[in-house]
């Protein structure tokens, strides 16, 4: 078979040339497509999970000792090792999407701390300012100023049925397919206990620079308000704070506060509301002394 090649007339190319082009294109595209698929896969997985806090057990134990040995020595008899084991037993080796309130009951029963009457400060969408305020008004307690809130603040944790270890890498995000995560159930349980143990006049710091300062969907609006005991709590004071230089989207005259007032009054608890409660405004103004809404205070 003479091996002669036709010189290609303009336009039609020999098959081998085309197959080479195809191979080159495939050679280039396939890895790109594969990389894209892997990247999307990782992204979706990342979206369904979030980083668990590294060394949660060590952090919880350390915070417990710091809190009970030098911040609140009156609690020095609390057994921090037992608190840690009781905390982790609530979620290790369990389905991280089906943790129950009962799982945390042994921890709630173990840690006994009473907040003095008239010293409970709730917050909603104003965590930083509430903590700055209670950091100055040291007799006031947010949940994170109590032992259980302090040991877990800003941590993420979960377990896994396949291991008795506390997960170090990723934990499932709380969403419709995974509604009862170890972290979210913990905050619901300790928020409920924090509200149940409140007495006298209690306070809530709300954010009037958000569309609705009060939301029934929030932990404060769905758990804490409904676990205040009217025979122990006679008054709720709301402070609607606005960001310095921020927009005033809601206030004590707003519809969301009217809703809060009616819920609280229906529970036979008196309700008062102040916009930009002055002492908390002072705390905000420490960081913005030049702002006109602060210079008037000086
Ligand atoms: C703290 C966390 C975390 O009154 C406050 C506190 O007592 C708190 O437990 O619940 C109230 C705030 O929750 P709310 O009203 O839903 O306000 P938010 O600004 O939307 O806060 C959402 C987070 C509340 C529960 N929570 N609290 N430290 O690390 C933490 N993680 C979660 N999920």
Curated annotation (Swiss-Prot):
Catalytic activity: NAD(+) = cyclic ADP-beta-D-ribose + nicotinamide + H(+); 2'-phospho-cyclic ADP-ribose + nicotinate = nicotinate-adenine dinucleotide phosphate; NAD(+) + H2O = ADP-D-ribose + nicotinamide + H(+); nicotinate + NADP(+) = nicotinate-adenine dinucleotide phosphate + nicotinamide
UniProt membrane topology term: Single-pass type II membrane protein
Alphabetical UniProt keywords: Cell membrane, Disulfide bond, Endoplasmic reticulum, Glycoprotein, Hydrolase, Membrane, Microsome, NAD, NADP, Signal-anchor, Transferase, Transmembrane, Transmembrane helix
SUPFAM superfamilies tied to this protein: N-(deoxy)ribosyltransferase-like
Protein origin, superkingdom: Eukaryota
CDD domains: Rib_hydrolase
Pfam families: Rib_hydrolayse
Gene: CD38
Transmembrane regions listed in the UniProt entry: 22-42
Extracellular side stretches: 43-298
Assembly: Homodimer.
Glycosylation sites: 98, 118, 177, 207, 268
Organism: Oryctolagus cuniculus (Rabbit)
Subcellular location: Cell membrane; Microsome membrane; Endoplasmic reticulum membrane
Reported function: Synthesizes cyclic ADP-ribose (cADPR), a second messenger for glucose-induced insulin secretion. Synthesizes the Ca(2+) mobilizer nicotinate-adenine dinucleotide phosphate, NAADP(+), from 2'-phospho-cADPR and nicotinic acid, as well as from NADP(+) and nicotinic acid. Also has cADPR hydrolase activity.
Expressing tissues: Osteoclasts.
Family statement drawn from the similarity comment of this UniProt entry: Belongs to the ADP-ribosyl cyclase family.
Active site annotation, chain numbering: 117, 199
Disulphide bond pairs: 64-80, 97-178, 158-171, 252-273, 285-294
Protein name per its UniProtKB record: ADP-ribosyl cyclase/cyclic ADP-ribose hydrolase 1
GO cellular component: endoplasmic reticulum membrane; intracellular membrane-bounded organelle; plasma membrane
MF terms in GO: NAD+ nucleosidase activity, cyclic ADP-ribose generating; phosphorus-oxygen lyase activity; transferase activity
Membrane side Cytoplasmic: residue ranges: 1-21
EC number: 3.2.2.-, 3.2.2.6, 2.4.99.20
